Amino acid sequence: MSFRKYYSWKYPDVPEDVAPLLLELKNSLVVVGVVGRSKCSLANKMSVFGMQPEETHEPANGQIMCYYKPGTSTLLLHFESTHDEVVLGQKLLEQTSIDFDHFYGNMRSQFVRMMLLALHTCHIVVYVETGQTFDPALVTICQLLKYVREQHLLEFLPQLLRETSAGNLLGDRARLCTPRILFIFENYPADVEKTREFISTHEFQTEDKIYELFRQYNIVMQSASNSLLALPNNKQFVFYNANEILRPDRLLLAIDALNATMYKQDVKEEEEDLEIIALAPFEGFVKPFGDAYTVRKSDEQLYRESHTVWHFLQRHVQDALEGCFDEGSFKQLSQSPPFQLLNFKTWHMCMVSIHKLLVGNVEDVNYVSTNAHYQAYLRDFTESLNYEKRFWYHLSELGLKKGISAYKHSAAVTYGSAAHKQMLANATLVFEEEGRGPYAELALAKLNDVCLRYWHDGRQQCEFPSLRGNPCILPRDVSHDKHSSGVVHISSCNCGRTLGRREDPYTLRQANYDYYEHMAVMCNLCVKVKRFQFPVFTPSISDYRAAAFEAAFPLLLQAHKNRAEPQVEEDSDQEANAAEEPYSQPATEAEPEPEKEPQASANEWSQPMSATYGSDLNMSIAGFGVSLKEGGAEAEVEEAEVCDKGSQDNSTSSDTSTESEIELQPKERSAQKANQILISTTEYLPGLVHMCSGLELLPLFPSWSLACVGPSSIYSHNTGLQEHFQSGFLSGANYLLPWDVQVRLVQPHYKHQQQQLMGKKNQRYRKQGDRLALKIFIGFEYECSRGHRFMMRSPERVLRGGADIERDTSTKVINNNMPLYFPCPCRAQNTFLAQLMRIHVVTPKAPVNIILDPKVLVGKYTFTLGCSILPMLSQSAYWILRLPYVYQGDNEIIAPPEKIEPTNRLAGGCILAGLFGIAETESMELKEPRITSMTFTRLQSHAYK
C-alpha cells in the first residue's frame, strides 16, 4: 500500500493549516460521509482508505473525525456511532437497566441520528461492513430514516434552517442532494477465489441484491425528491476488499521492510560470473533472493493494484464534480436544483446548523423549542423509531381482542369459577397464537381482568357447595330460596322398591330425611310398611335452637370433664340438677336412665353366651324375662366405655365355619334405679348421633330408617331379589347371604315355676329339644349415584350370582368391618363410588329376635342409631335398615372420598362388626300373634374367639 499524507481533526475544530487548502477548492468540495461498523479499538473505518486516527484518539458516540488529502476535492467525515464495537461496549458498561428492548431501541435511535446528519450534510455516504455479506437490517434502518425524514424533519427542518445563518441555501429539501450510497466490505468470502472474474461476479451479485431490496421497500425511487438515497445506474457501488490486509501485524510489517532493504535484483550473468559461481560451495550461494529483472507483472497483479477503495470512490466523486451525479439514478429529475456543491465555509456553516438541530439540542435536556413539531421530535424521537414496540403492542392488542372474543363466545348465561378458569385458559391459548413479546404479560393481565369483570357482571353463579361438594349453579345476584347444583343422583326409597331422582342435597335434612319422605309418598310399599320410630327432638317452646357449643359438641371437652369430676359425683349432680332444669322433660318409662354402677352389676340382665363347634362370632345375644323393657340400663354405660376407649375393631374372620351354636342362659333380675334421662326440649342436636354425643340431645329428624317390608316368604334364595320388589340391582348381585346359627337355651333350676306358666304351644316347642337351628339371611347393599345396587360377599368382593351363593355364607360380612364406600362394578368411563345404604335382614321362624346395633366409623366419629333401647326385629319378617346418605360430625360434614385405594378400602369409613345380636322371645310375646312392641333395650356386645 502506498501511504500519502493526509490531515485529520475532530469536528467542529478546523486546523489552521487545513482551512486555506479547503477554501481553495471553492465550489468543488465533495463531502463523503463514512458510517457503518468497525471492530478495532479506535473505532476506525478509514483503514480501507489508508488512514488512521492518532494513537491518543478516544472513540465516543456521536464524535465526527474529518480527513482530507491535499490535492483532492474530497472531504471525508468519519461518524462514530453505536454500530462501532468499542462504542457499543461503552454503552453496555453504562447500562443500568436489564431491559434489552429498551437498550436496543436507544442504540438504534442514536445510530439513526448520525445517519440523518450524514444524509443531510454529505454528497456521498459510504457504509462500511465488517461482514462478508449484506446485512438486511440496514434496510430497516433506511426505512426508519425515510419515515423520520418525511414525517418529522420536513415539518420543521426547512423552517428552522431559514432562521439560521444557513438561510435558504439548502432549499425545501434541507439537504445538499439525494446522497449516493456506496458499500464497502472489508472482508472477502474465504470460499471464493480471489481472481478478477470471481471478485467482479461477487460484487455484481451483491449489487443486484441491494438494488432489489432498496427498490422493494421504496428506499430508492424513480424521483430524486421522494427517494431517500441514490444508487448509480451504470457504475459499481459495491466494493470487496479482496487483497489488502487492512490491519496487519506490525511485527510482520517490520520483517517485510527488512527483507525489502536486503533485496537486490538479478542482472545478466557474464562468463566470468559463471566461473565464480562454480566455486560456490552449494547452489544459490551469494545469489540474491528475488525475481529476475526480466519478470513482468501479470494482469491479475495489475488488477489488484488498481482495485482499491480510493480509486473506487474517486469515480463517484468525479461524477459529482462533472455535474452528472443524478443522471442515470432517477428517471424523473426534480425541477429544483438537484445537486449543490458548496465551498468549505458555506458548507461548514450549514453543517453547524444542521448538527445543532438534529444532534446538539437533543443532548440538552433543558432545551425547549417553540416549534411544536420540533419539540415532538426532541421528545418522541426514540419512541417513534421503536417499531418493534409498536409491533409487539399491536400483536398483544390483536391477541387480546381474540382472547376476549373467544371467552365471551364460550360463556354461558351463568357459570362458576371452574368454568371461568377453563374458559380463561382457552382464551389465553387463543391470545398466545397472536400475542407475544414484552407486552404479552401486561396483555394477559388485562385479559384476566376483562374476563373477570365480564364474569362478575351478572354471570357469576352462587357456587355455594353442596354436601357432596358440587357448586350451586343459580345466579349469584338473583335471590333464591334454596340452592341447586344441577347434579341429579339416582337413589332408592327407604324400602328399596322405587328408584327416584335425587337433587344434590345442601342440607342434612334434605339428604337424610326430606328425600325419603318424598319418595315414601310415591312408593306404594313405603306407605304400607311398619317403621321403627327413632327418637327425635320435640320442642316445648317456639324459639328452640341448636345446642350450644359445649352441649352439642361434648367430644371436644370430654377429656377436660373426665379430669375435672369423678364419675360418682357426676351422677349425683345430674340427679340433683334434673329437677331444676325447666327446659328438660323426663324420658318415658320405657326408656329409663341407665344406672352409673360397675359393669358387673349393670349387666345382670344380659345373658352369657358359649359358642360350640369352634365357631367364631361377634354379636350380642341375650334372653329376656318378663321385665324385658327394663333391661336397657346398660346403654349409656356402653356408650361411655366406647367413647373412652375409642372405636375398636372387634371383627374376626371365620371363612370355614358356616354354623354357630349359641347357649342362652337367662339371668336373674335385680333392682335398678328409676333414674330418668333428661331430654332437652329447647335445644336440638345439629348433627348425627354418635358415641360421644350423649342422649340428652336429640336430632330434629331421623337420619336412619328401619322398616319391616313384609314377611320372610317374599324372599326366595333361588331367585334372589326380584326387580318388582327391589329395583336397580346389578345382575347376579341381588342375593342375600345365609347365616346358619344353632341356639341352645340352658334353663336354671330356679326358673321351673316360670316354665310351668308357659302354654302348651311353648311346651311343644321346647319338646323338640334344647337346640334351635336358625337360618337368617343377611345382605349389605351398596348403591352408586347412578342408581346401581349390589350386594357384597366380603369386604373386598362383590356378590357375583349363583356360584358365590353356593360357596359363601354371611360369615365374612358379619365378622368383618364392611367398607362404607366401594367402587361400583358398573361399566362406566369414570369409576363411581357406591355407598353402603341398606342392610337387609330376613328373620327366621323361631322364638328369637334379631337385635340391630349398627356403628358406622367415619373419621374420628362412630355414628349410632341414637336409641337408648336397641331395635329388636320380629320373627319371620323381612327388615331393611337404611343408613344415612350424608354423615355430619360435631362441626363438619364428612365428604366421601374421591377414590378408594385397593390396599385400604376402609379408609373412607366402615360399619363395625358386631352389628347383629340374638335374643330369646318372651313367653308373653309368643302368645300374641301381633308383631312385638317397638320399644327395645340396648344389649352389651361380646366377642368370642
From Swiss-Prot:
It comes from Drosophila grimshawi. This is Nonsense-mediated mRNA decay factor SMG8. The keyword Membrane does not apply. GO terms for biological process: nuclear-transcribed mRNA catabolic process, nonsense-mediated decay. Belongs to the SMG8 family. Keywords: Nonsense-mediated mRNA decay. Coiled coil: none annotated. InterPro entries: SMG8-like. Involved in nonsense-mediated decay (NMD) of mRNAs containing premature stop codons. Probable component of kinase complex containing nonC and recruited to stalled ribosomes. Residues 563-604, 633-671 are annotated as: Disordered.
